[in-house]
Amino acid sequence: MFHEAVTHRPAYHTDPFFLQSDAMRKLVAATAQQADLALIEGAMGFYDGIGQTSEASAYTVSQWLETPAVLVVNPQKMGRSVAAICKGFLQLEPHNRIAGFLLNRVRSGMATYYQEIIERETGLPVYGYLPELLEVQLPSRHLGLYTAEEVDTLQEKIDLLGETARKTIVLERLQALAETAPPLPLPELPSMPPHSFRLGVAKDAAFCFYYAENLELLQRNGAELVFFSPLTDSALPEQLDGLYLGGGYPELYLPQLSGNHAFLESLRTAAQKQLPIFAECGGFLYLQQSIQDAQGKIFPMAGLLSGTATMGNRLCRFGYVTMTAQQDTLCAEKGAVIRAHSFHYADSTENGTAFSVQRPNGRTWLEVQQQGSILAGFPHWYFPSCPEAAQRFAEQCRRYQKRRNNGCRF
């Protein structure tokens, strides 16, 4: 969300757990066609992958895309030791693509000092630094940073960072470095098909976590995306053929969500008509009978699924998962395999049994509810890892549309 706020472009996931190398190269080539620079952020440390390996790490991404990597280094409270850190990264995997460094949270008077040490010891350039700017620091909470929409004066913070970077980072050298990456072959993508069904997508402060690739893949299967807000709307949009309730922070808006009786009634009416509904994480919580907050107060919710949810103070089933359908469901036939990610502090008395879920370390359990026309659970699905899931969801929506247009009773 912050990437999109800064660039005014969709942000995509170059994640080796979700994508094979060819698919990742096609994704980057296709989405960067209209850009001068494709900037890829490593979410954790450069070599931090699955388990104790570098598998599916930022290092893997740089290898697959053949792109140079610039390490961001925080050298506070260090002297020459910063060179040991930099050299350690260079030596851990000898065939890495590390091409230089950026210094973070460094006083202007110390930047040259660190730059000289690093360049002398590693032989690689330091492209500049960013000082510590208290004015742009962002607050955090249990699921990470606040969302871009919640940050006051966000544009002013972005502007200040940009103005500072122009003064302290040699941006022209970074641009020249990026141009050393070999071109990626452009995939032949068909044009977007005409809309064949209307898909409602919850999008507000409570429901804001979606993979852009999921929405685009649904569009490529004919979806017209119709955005709405469970927080502020009094009813679902008209003439919908399906619903997608994504993740977010519903636990921060429990009084508003629970108190929007008109919208909840509209949602229940749609569910009674067997409208296809796919819900992830926060959307799954919203469909429960109730949610109990961290203080023990219970808020009634949509009541479309069996089970009640409780907010906790520790992560539940966090990380990458591979899911295998144990039955035919809204988005997957029995036996279908899709990759996903879980990141939540809530738990439910009824997590479901529609999918067998496996962590990379081999741990398995059952999860995800399939009730009537509703498929819902905690994992965030990545549709490109199983395009048939998006196709099946789209087909179910078109079947509903056909029944609706024929005036069938539900």
What is the meaning of each model-derived region?
Residues P250-T329:
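Cysteine-nucleophile active-site neighborhood
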Residues L39-E41, V70-V72, L102, Y244-G246, ...:
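Structural motif
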Residues M1-L65, A69, V73-R97, G109-T112:
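ATP-dependent carboxylate-amine ligase catalytic core
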Residues S62, K167-T168, P193-H195, F207-Q219, ...:
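C-terminal and late-domain segments of enzyme folds
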Residues T60-V61, I118, L217, T269:
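Hydrophobic/aromatic ligand-binding patch that stacks against planar heteroaromatic rings
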Residues S196-Q272:
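Phosphate-binding active sites in nucleotide-utilizing proteins
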Residues G79-S191:
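Internal gly/pro-rich beta-alpha loop/helix module
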